[in-house]
Amino acid sequence: MFRGHFKHTVDPKGRLSIPAKFREALADGHGDKVVIVPCGDALEVHPLQLWHALEERVNGLPRFDPDRRRVQYAYISLAQDVTLDPQGRIQIPADYRERVGLVKDVLIIGLTDKFEVWDAERWAHFQRDHDGPLDDLFERLAGKGV
């Protein structure tokens, strides 16, 4: 489980140290292999096993389903396998850093089954734009059984 948020930095070589708490979560059954994929304003980081499960669900859709093809072209095709180095870092390719605006200061946020890496400034803007009472959200989620 990935919970919480952590301030970190991307070094000039594009390496990012994964928080110890998240490394522990990966070690509990997931190992040191992850899948990274840029999505919107963030870089998603998925445990390899959970990514494989996602791919299987997508592959379970009819072969010519337009949604299947779109998610394969626009999302899955961008995914890249990455292994944590002995210091617990991942290497983020330059084009991925550019795509989601990762320069130096980042926020790593846990989203239960995955985590995301955000440029700190973009995250602050996102938070401001989505700030407010959560009562309506919690009510909608309760209606969905959460």
Positions of PLM-derived features:
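Short, charged/polar, Gly/Pro-enriched secondary-structure boundary elements
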Residues: H52-L54, W123-Q127
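A short beta-strand-loop micro-motif that forms or neighbors metal/cofactor-
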Residues: D28-L43, A79, G101-W118, D135
